[in-house]
A protein has these predicted regions:
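Membrane-embedded alpha-helical bundles of multi-pass enzymes
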Residues: 1-169
């Protein structure tokens, strides 16, 4: 799950390998078919951790530019920031597992709750909307124009729908 999230984050700028968003379907199926809600939540958290570790690791480099006294602190932002951001994906996976009765229903709930948790991450707690899945449309200006109608979180819902589509198959 962690590796799938990390590789899927390569859809974001500057890489923009948009088809990799489909890798999110693998952890989505693990979440939907998990034996317990706890395992579903763990899979969601690991996927989110991989996504954010691969996409915000560079923030930790600010500690080591100039003064080498801060090297011991490097693991804090390198691991801590992705952990905090991934914690928003945990309730999405847990609620999807809890509310859905079938694999398809759980996938549908997961799509909805991931989009809502991304909104919450950007507005409610962290105010840190960086690296939302909707940013994958940055490489395609005509599609990016739809942000004027649906905003970043509408694009995030669309990106997640594309990522989870193979799981619905």
């Amino acid at each position: 799950c962690c590796l799938a999230g990390a590789v899927a984050s390569l859809t974001l700028p500057p890489f923009g390998v948009v088809p990799l968003i489909a890798l999110l379907s693998w952890p989505a199926l693990i979440i939907a078919n998990a034996a317990t809600m706890r395992r579903a939540a763990l899979a969601g958290g690991l996927t989110g951790f991989g996504w954010f570790l691969a996409s915000v690791w560079w923030i930790s480099l600010s500690l080591v530019t100039g003064d080498s006294n801060y090297w011991p602190l490097l693991p804090l932002p390198l691991i801590g920031i992705p952990l905090i951001l991934a914690s928003f994906w945990v309730p999405a996976a847990a609620l999807a597992h809890r509310l859905g009765r079938s694999t398809g229903a759980r996938l549908g709930w997961l799509l909805l709750f991931l989009a809502l948790c991304e909104w919450a991450r950007g507005h409610v707690a962290t105010g840190f909307p960086w690296n939302a899945p909707g940013y994958l449309f940055s490489a395609n200006l005509p599609l990016l124009q739809s942000a004027s109608l649906v905003g970043l979180y509408g694009l995030t819902l669309l990106a997640l729908a594309a990522g989870l589509a193979p799981a619905f198959w």
